[in-house]
C-alpha cells in the first residue's frame, strides 16, 4: 500500500491507521509473504479505508485490517482462482472469477474470515429430444452424436472479470454488478438474494 497524497494538490491528510506521514510514494504497508502463493488479481478497500481485501491466483481471499495492527486474515478456498473482489459492507466482500459465480465472504470484528454462500442459484437442466439437424451439427462441431449440453448452470457462461458496486456504496451495498468474458453484465440485488438463499444475511 503506497501513499498517493500530492502536496499542494490534495488537502492535508489526517492521520489514519495506515500511518501519519504520507509523502507521495511512501510505502504504508506491505503484505508480501503473508501466505499467498499466487499473483494478486484484485484489491478493494472497505468504505472506512481501514480494511483491504485482495484475491490471488492460488484461490485465496485475504483481508488486512490496519486498525488492528495490520492483522491479515486468509481463507484458502476450494474454488477456481478469483479475479475480482469488492467490499459490499464493512465486514462483507463479494469475489468472483473462473467459477463464473459471485461468492460472498464475511470477515467479523475478530478477524475471522469465512465463506458464506455462492450467490448464483443453479438453473434446473431440462431434458429434451434432439432433432436430426442438431445430431448432424453435434457430429460436425463436437465429434459426437450425443446431446451434451455445454451450457453452464450459472448466469455467466465464462469467467467473471469485474465486480463493482451498482447501488448505494461500499458501506451498505444494495445491488452490485458483474461483467465477464462472455460479454454479459449482470445486476445482483441483495434483497432478492436474501429471500431466495436460506440464511443469507449481509453483515
Residue map of PLM features:
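Per-blade loop-tip surfaces of WD-repeat and WD-like beta-propellers in eukaryotic adaptors/scaffolds
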Residues: 1-30, 58-73, 104-114, 142-146, ...
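Canonical WD40 repeat/beta-propeller blade segments in eukaryotic WD-repeat proteins
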Residues: 32-45, 79-87, 157-168
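Conserved GH/AH loop at the N-terminal boundary of individual WD40 repeats
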Residues: 34-36, 77-78, 119-122, 156, ...
Amino acid at each position: 500500500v503506497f501513499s498517493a497524497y500530492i502536496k499542494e494538490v490534495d488537502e492535508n491528510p489526517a492521520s489514519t491507521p495506515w500511518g501519519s506521514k504520507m509523502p507521495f510514494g511512501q510505502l504504508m504497508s506491505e503484505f508480501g509473504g503473508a501466505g499467498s502463493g499466487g499473483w494478486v488479481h484484485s484489491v478493494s478497500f472497505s468504505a472506512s479505508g481501514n480494511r483491504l481485501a485482495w484475491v490471488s491466483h492460488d484461490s485465496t481471499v485475504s483481508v488486512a485490517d490496519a486498525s488492528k495492527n495490520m492483522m491479515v486474515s486468509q481463507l484458502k478456498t476450494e474454488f477456481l482462482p478469483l479475479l475480482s473482489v469488492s467490499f459490499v459492507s464493512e465486514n462483507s466482500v463479494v469475489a468472483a472469477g473462473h467459477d463464473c459465480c459471485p461468492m460472498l465472504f464475511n470477515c467479523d470484528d475478530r478477524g475471522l474470515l469465512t465463506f458464506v454462500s455462492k450467490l448464483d442459484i443453479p438453473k434446473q437442466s431440462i431434458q429434451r429430444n434432439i432433432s436430426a439437424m442438431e445430431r448432424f451439427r453435434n457430429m460436425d462441431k463436437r465429434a459426437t452424436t450425443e446431446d451434451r449440453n455445454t451450457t453452464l448452470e450459472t448466469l455467466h457462461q465464462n469467467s467473471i472479470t469485474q465486480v463493482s458496486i451498482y447501488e448505494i456504496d461500499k458501506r451498505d451495498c444494495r445491488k452490485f454488478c458483474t461483467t465477464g468474458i462472455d460479454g454479459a453484465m449482470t445486476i445482483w440485488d441483495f434483497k432478492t438474494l436474501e429471500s431466495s438463499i436460506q440464511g443469507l444475511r449481509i453483515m
